Amino acid sequence: MTDTLLPAAPQPLEKEGDDYFRKGCNPLAQTGRSKLQNQRAALNQQILKAVRMRTGAENLLKVATNQKVREQVRLELSFVNSDLQMLKEELEGLNISVGVYQGTEEAFTIPLIPLGLKETKEVDFSIVFKDFILEHYSEDSYLYEDDIADLMDLRQACRTPSRDEAGVELLMSYFIQLGFVESRFFPPTRHMGLLFTWYDSFTGVPVSQQTLLLEKASVLFNIGALYTQIGTRCNRQTQAGLESAVDAFQRAAGVLNYLKETFTHTPSYDMSPAMLSVLVKMMLAQAQESVFEKVCLPGIQNEFFVLVKVAQEAAKVAEAYRQLHAAMSQEPVKENIPYSWASVAYVKAYHYGALAHYFAATLLIDHQLKPGADEDHQEKCLSQLYDRMPEGMTPLATLKNAGQRVLLGKGHLHRAIGFHEESLREANLCKKLRDIQVLRDVLSAAHQRTQLKHTQHREDDDLLNLIDAPDVLPKTEREVKITFPDFSKVTVTDFFQKLGPLSVFSASKRWSPPRGIHFTVEEGDLGFTLRGNTPVQVHFLDPHCSASLAGAKEGDYIVSIQGVDCKWLTVSEVMKLLKSFGGEEVEMKVVSLLDSTSSMHNKCATYSVGMQKTYSMICLSMDDDDKADKTKKISKKLSFLSWGTSKNRQKSASTLCLPEVGLARSQNKKKLPTPFSLLNSDSSLY
């Protein structure tokens, strides 16, 4: 019979009044955001069903020989593929449902894009953890039922976090807690039989894994997604609100970048390095857009130096969105990112580019170099506005020559109108963007304002004397940057601290069952000394002392004395406890460290219903192939939702299943993985 230990007095995990910390939003609350998440969960289930049906039809098509059966299967397969395409479009519609996440204040501003939270299935830790506690730690598992329940409640709360800092802390606390759990219950030499399932945020396809890699990466993704939702709900009509938005998007970029650099073999395409790089760019672009809105919020004065600054700020935002759109257009991101997101990036790139040209035209047409003006400063600002001046023009000559200024200004207006028309065209082409009325209103208002300015200064020979205005150089007074996550601000106590100090009592170390040492505590000399922090070890053991004769060994860890848990007691505390039993016989329970079986770290099998290979499997196969043969041809990675059939398609399972221990399969091929009012002649543009 395995000896068991009495638990130490449980320490409070949190201070009183912090009960909210483990709670998420009410999952039954019918808010706009919860409705969207419920729709996402329902779509995920429909996609799972459709993918399984497609997989079954493809398998039947491979083995069927009857021509009529094959024709019928092909017909059914075409219906299933059509359904999958429709479901994908519905999921894309949820990803572009930006109105729900915006602030409640009425604002004439372009909506920002948030990320939706990844959905997951429930996981029951109780049986697996209780078995492991009994087997590995030799303790009564029923003593930890409340702790396991707390962990499961925390995970459940993380599925519906509140859209504020408390929600972020909730997710961070679970992420930190997962680090404790991984060390306590997940040995590096075997799997625990728990299957963690998360749904891809963009495709809805479920991916399952038996290690905590997927769980931790998905929680990090949701922390970043929650920051984006916090950023989009900020009041962008106040300086404080815009500052909060900038901070939130920078933090979102930091979390996503941390995810990309820390979890390189994530098994889902929405968390692949290529996709995460694009998402980081998108968050920084939206942060830069908020910086521009913050500059414009007090009103743009019709003054030379102010207009130079605003024009370059707008050009900076346009540059950020151009780079974002270029990244979204690359493979393999292009296959899985919502098309409407790429359209938004394209629209904003041209919209803010048009604003840069409009403000440049305004400063050239409306302002003259007056006597007594700071000529040198204006010349310097104008020269810094462009990479190069148009042929035959110099900054100082242009400032002094009214005709040249107006001519160059008209060139900027001409380019601004072209950019406005291109942004409106793209917004009208995308069905999802046509439904966002505020976006169309902002684009139309900016276009009309530029056209009015052009009409006020139009002449008959404009087409003959038109100058091709150069691009406005991007420049900003505040360069947005990644804000890395600070997990130290969240204080978390290990749910399973009763098992003992984590540095000693972990899943990576094997222990003997607790042995009872019955000996008499002699006055003065115990026959051994103690060393270490917590728990303490037996040291310098006299082979003739009563403890040694009772079975104690040098190096043993003392875990209890007379039923008192000693795993967290220091040397002085244990010594004081022993001496309190002077002259009496005591029972001291000890454990010995066993040699760990040498074994390579198991690579975790990843399961994705109906998928050829997940991202992590591709990366793992690459690692293996590099060792075997570095000259193998790299084949193109297939899309996560490739609707058609392929001759070289690998066989896929229609159901999720647990892997067999020790089963290894060789890989034969290597895969790579603002409001704008019309400009008057007054000193203010707004």
Swiss-Prot record:
CDD domains: BRO1_Rhophilin_2, HR1_Rhophilin-2, PDZ_rhophilin-like. The modification Phosphothreonine is found at T655. Residues 26-100 form the REM-1 domain. Residues 46-66 are annotated as: Interaction with Rho. Disulfide bonds: none annotated. It comes from the Eukaryota. One of its GO terms (biological process) is glomerular filtration. Keywords: Coiled coil, Cytoplasm, Phosphoprotein. It is found in: Cytoplasm, Perinuclear region. Pfam families: BRO1, HR1, PDZ. One of its GO terms (cellular component) is perinuclear region of cytoplasm. Residues 111-502 form the BRO1 domain. Residues 515-593 form the PDZ domain. Belongs to the RHPN family. Interacts with GTP-bound RhoA and RhoB. Interacts with both GTP- and GDP-bound RhoA. Interacts with KRT18. Binds specifically to GTP-Rho. May function in a Rho pathway to limit stress fiber formation and/or increase the turnover of F-actin structures in the absence of high levels of RhoA activity. This is Rhophilin-2. It comes from Mus musculus.
